């Protein structure tokens, strides 16, 4: 049985002692006097912890022992594609010629960097069937917002001011309606049919002269391929709308079929999902947006272009109807480097194999778990890259909820899947193993879920009170939401006031 390390580790600020030094800055070659305007000068000293290098190493090593990441084991968060992040990516991205260039350098001195961005765009165009890409967006949701703003700009440019609605399936990512709303659109929800795919009759009834576009993930968040996608495209295009592809689940069709060939006009991708760059604190992310030829003039500026005659790459601001910038400078460059490294190493055949193994793994897990007491597999049996089970029967029969199952999985040293999503599946367990996971890891995951089922029906309290073997047990979610303590300054002030006692 798994046992996670548990350290009573203080914050690094609490380890601070005056005079302790972990790093000494080199002395300047000569005295440099800089006149800093008074309004820019700090009024109080900068509060940085004073700790030695050994203390820093021990502190973060202990914290890492209370953590779990993709290098620890299976991390099957559905619709997140938590695949292995190859270490060669980091090695290339940390090369001095990558790490120490500056975005304000003259173009002539960063031709290699611009070439990397240009080459990455060519790969993404080939993979998706799009004609032009911006690499600016910093994340998937940032990419979504960019794509929706392009839809808006396109319709306004044509004088179609009545197009105020974005259609979104009921199985969509939560960021889809959020992005559409932020762009000023009314969101119209399209229900799923009994197969878990878009209900064509409902879509036909929803489209109108007010339709700006439809946002769709394919495969969808149930892991099911929208096999009527060509008909969906016809319905949307017939009324003058655009079809937007949320690339969150591209890993399930990589190298097999292209969004552009399905009828999509706009695509956003997640380099931190499909193309192996790290998520979250290991990131940042990147959410490139690709468009068909007729939309390229609306992309954010600048684009990266190539002057063949002079063999020169350059930042291209000649984008007549651009929506402007969606991020400062030119995107998260180090992430772009990591993604291109992955693409070059994998090659076309390797990328095709990625989707084949990802789909095989998801279906193997689904088949092995299907029929286990308390878990139900709604909709179609055959899935792509992920599978969504419902633990509603278990909840009704034992009182054990999906949340309890997820917490109990941690006791086995396994990361929980995405839970309670998509919303159309009650007590959802959304499992995406990715291609990085071995058969042995899949078997262990299924056995843990089966063991939890057995416990739920024989000793439900052990599941309801889980986890038992982790550094942190159940946190107070309500308190965290009502009284967030997210900085050292907030923590210190609240503690001085006696409002927190930890």
From Swiss-Prot:
UniProt-listed GO biological process terms: glycine decarboxylation via glycine cleavage system
Superkingdom: Archaea
Catalytic activity line of the entry: N(6)-[(R)-lipoyl]-L-lysyl-[glycine-cleavage complex H protein] + glycine + H(+) = N(6)-[(R)-S(8)-aminomethyldihydrolipoyl]-L-lysyl-[glycine-cleavage complex H protein] + CO2
Assembly behavior: The glycine cleavage system is composed of four proteins: P, T, L and H. In this organism, the P 'protein' is a heterodimer of two subunits.
Record EC number: 1.4.4.2
Pfam families: GcvP2_C, GDC-P
Gene that this sequence comes from: gcvPB
Taxonomic placement: Archaea, Methanobacteriati, Methanobacteriota, Thermococci, Thermococcales
Record-stated family: Belongs to the GcvP family. C-terminal subunit subfamily.
InterPro entries listed in its UniProt record: GcvPB, GDC-P_C, GDC-P_N, GDC_P, PyrdxlP-dep_Trfase, PyrdxlP-dep_Trfase_major, PyrdxlP-dep_Trfase_small
Gene Ontology terms, MF aspect: glycine binding; glycine dehydrogenase (decarboxylating) activity; pyridoxal phosphate binding
N6-(pyridoxal phosphate)lysine sites (modified residues): 273
Function: The glycine cleavage system catalyzes the degradation of glycine. The P protein binds the alpha-amino group of glycine through its pyridoxal phosphate cofactor; CO(2) is released and the remaining methylamine moiety is then transferred to the lipoamide cofactor of the H protein.
A GO cellular-component term linked to this record: glycine cleavage complex
Protein name (database record): Probable glycine dehydrogenase (decarboxylating) subunit 2
């Amino acid at each position: 049985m798994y046992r996670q390390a548990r350290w009573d580790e203080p914050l690094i600020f609490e380890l601070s002692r005056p005079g302790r030094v972990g790093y000494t800055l080199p002395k300047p070659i000569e005295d440099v006097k800089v006149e800093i305007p008074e309004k820019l000068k700090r009024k109080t000293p900068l509060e940085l912890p004073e700790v030695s290098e050994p203390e820093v190493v021990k502190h973060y090593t202990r914290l890492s022992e209370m953590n779990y990441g993709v290098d620890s084991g299976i991390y099957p968060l559905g619709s997140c594609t938590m695949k292995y992040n190859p270490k060669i990516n980091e090695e290339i991205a940390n090369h001095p010629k990558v790490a120490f260039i500056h975005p304000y350098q003259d173009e002539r001195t960063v031709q290699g960097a611009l070439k990397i961005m240009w080459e990455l765009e060519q790969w993404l165009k080939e993979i998706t069937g799009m004609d032009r890409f911006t690499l600016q967006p910093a994340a998937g949701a940032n990419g979504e917002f960019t794509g929706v703003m392009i839809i808006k700009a396109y319709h306004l440019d044509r004088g179609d001011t009545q197009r105020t609605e974005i259609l979104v399936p009921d199985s969509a990512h939560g960021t889809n309606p959020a992005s559409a709303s932020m762009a000023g659109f009314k969101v119209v929800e399209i229900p799923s049919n009994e197969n878990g795919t878009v209900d064509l009759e409902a879509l036909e009834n929803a489209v109108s002269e007010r339709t700006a576009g439809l946002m769709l993930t394919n495969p969808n968040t149930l892991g099911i391929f929208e096999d009527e996608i060509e008909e969906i495209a016809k319905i949307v295009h017939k009324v003058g709308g655009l079809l937007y592809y949320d690339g969150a689940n591209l890993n399930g069709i990589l190298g097999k079929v292209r969004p552009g060939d399905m009828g999509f006009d706009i695509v956003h991708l997640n380099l931190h999902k499909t193309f192996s760059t790290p998520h979250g604190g290991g990131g940042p992310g990147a959410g490139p947006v690709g468009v068909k030829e007729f939309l390229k003039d609306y992309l954010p500026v600048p684009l990266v272009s190539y002057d063949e005659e002079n063999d020169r790459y350059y930042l291209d601001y000649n984008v007549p109807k651009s929506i402007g910038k969606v991020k400062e400078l030119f995107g998260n460059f180090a992430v772009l480097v990591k993604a291109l490294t992955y693409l070059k190493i994998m090659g076309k055949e390797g990328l095709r194999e990625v989707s084949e193994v990802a789909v095989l793994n998801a279906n193997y897990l689904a088949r092995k778990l299907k029929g286990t007491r308390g878990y139900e597999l709604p909709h179609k049996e055959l899935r792509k890259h992920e599978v969504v089970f419902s633990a509603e029967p278990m909840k009704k029969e034992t009182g054990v909820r999906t949340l309890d199952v997820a917490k109990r999985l941690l006791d086995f040293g396994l990361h929980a899947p995405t839970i309670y999503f998509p919303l159309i599946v009650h007590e959802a367990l959304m499992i995406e193993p990715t291609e990085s996971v071995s058969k042995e890891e899949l078997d262990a995951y299924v056995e843990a879920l089966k063991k939890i089922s057995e416990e739920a029906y024989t000793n439900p309290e052990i599941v309801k009170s889980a986890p038992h073997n982790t550094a942190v047990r159940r946190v107070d979610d309500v308190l965290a939401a009502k009284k967030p303590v997210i900085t050292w300054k907030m923590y210190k002030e609240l503690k001085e006031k006696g409002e927190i006692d930890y």
